[in-house]
Amino acid sequence: SDEHLLIVDKPSGVLVVPAAGRSGPTMVDVLKKQLGRPVTAVHRLDEETTGCLAFAFSEDARSGLDAIFRDHTAIRDYLALTTAVPSPESGCIESNLEEGRDGIVRVVRRGGRRGVTHYETVSRRGRGCLVRCRLETGRRNQIRVHLAALGCPVAGDRKYGYRARSGESFPRVMLHSSS
């Protein structure tokens, strides 16, 4: 951290900001209490996703960081443990994404918002693998939807296609924001 911004390692199971119909402390609440000063989330991570999360201490810092994210110049890398190997093992997924009334984000032919995820297989083990994903855009559940569309859902992601196999147990969506 410095006088303008703070990067934290977000744990699983914590919302970044308040959400309708949900209660409990958010990352913003926890940081305000710990630091004794206001903070603003610059971007969001899904509740179950762990890893790097940026906060701004001032409106100027938030505005500057917003511009970096809006212009897609922020490097946003994630690591995902998947239940199958993507084919091809590296590439770019580009599709339009739209959230339905049921809260599920889907790939759509018309409408929606453009989502672009670059991915590469880092290592393989059994039927699954570790995949590095770099976001070009940042849509809700983008990596989870894109990997599921490739036939290799993120381990533990029951919302987007993960089905437990015998002897397999993942306590959460196995997705981590690494930068």
Task: Report each predicted region and the residues it spans.
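Generic signature of intrinsically disordered, low-complexity segments enriched in small/polar residues
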Residues: 58, 72, 81, 122, ...
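RNA pseudouridine synthases
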Residues: 1-106, 110-116, 124-126, 174
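Pseudouridine synthase
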Residues: 23-27, 31, 99, 126-179
